[in-house]
Design a protein with these regions (language model features):
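Short, well-ordered, mixed-charge alpha-helical segments that flank or form enzyme active sites
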Residues: 83-87, 109-116, 155-157
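Nucleotide 5′-phosphate-binding alpha/beta core
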Residues: 1-36, 42-74, 80-83, 140
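Adenylate-forming
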Residues: 119-170
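Short amphipathic alpha-helical face segments that pack within enzyme cores
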Residues: 55, 59, 89, 153-156
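Short loop/turn segments at strand-loop or loop-helix junctions that form parts
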Residues: 36-39, 102-109, 151-152
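Short, flexible helix-coil linker/hinge segments at the edges of structured domains or between repeats
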Residues: 94-130
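Conserved AMP-binding loop of ANL adenylate-forming enzymes
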Residues: 66-104
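Acidic/glycine-enriched edge-of-secondary-structure segments
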Residues: 42-52, 111-123, 143-148
Length: 170
């Protein structure tokens, strides 16, 4: 059995080193995406991605009700954008449904550094900056009707949207 022959995979193997070592010969000539996790705890774990994010999110798209996530609607993603699989996936989801994905990047590694340095005021300013960028995009682009964000960003966005009678499907 292959699993017995190969042994248990160690997640730490993903930290550093040539990423191409994980690309099998069958995919060596395919476009490869890389994404990272765990960068706030040292060298990030780098993982490869070929087409699975497209396949996953095209299937996911079929579960979205068109009345809540209209085809052709533009999307706004507020969250970590790169190097993240999620950014690729949400951008592809918007495109697959006929829309454009606008992005506001949130750098969680920077937020963690600010917290570790005790820079809570600076962290709050950064959070406000991210929300302000999102609101600017929402005001500038009437076609944005769908939102992908983290729960911690959703609340302040809603607090700023509802009084101004702006609405998106979240």
């Amino acid at each position: 059995d292959d699993l017995d022959r190969l042994g248990e995979f160690q997640a730490e193997w993903l930290r550093g080193g040539p990423v191409r070592r994980w690309v099998t010969r069958a995919y060596k000539d395919q476009p490869i995406y890389t994404f990272e996790t765990g960068g706030s705890t040292g060298v990030p774990k780098s993982r490869i991605n070929i087409n699975d994010f497209r396949i996953d999110y095209e299937l996911y798209s079929k579960t979205l009700p068109d009345d809540k996530f209209p085809k052709g609607a533009d999307w706004l993603m507020v969250g970590p954008s790169g190097p993240r699989r999620l950014r690729l996936a949400i951008e592809h989801l918007a495109q697959h449904r006929g829309g454009i994905c606008f992005m506001v990047d949130l750098d969680p590694r920077w937020v963690i550094k600010l917290i570790k340095m005790g820079e809570m005021e600076m962290m709050e300013l950064y959070k406000r900056h991210v929300i302000d960028q999102a609101l600017t995009l929402l005001r500038a682009h009437d076609g944005i009707h769908c939102l992908f964000t983290t729960p911690k960003r959703l609340k302040p966005l809603c607090e700023n949207l509802w009084p101004k009678k702006m609405a998106i499907n979240a």
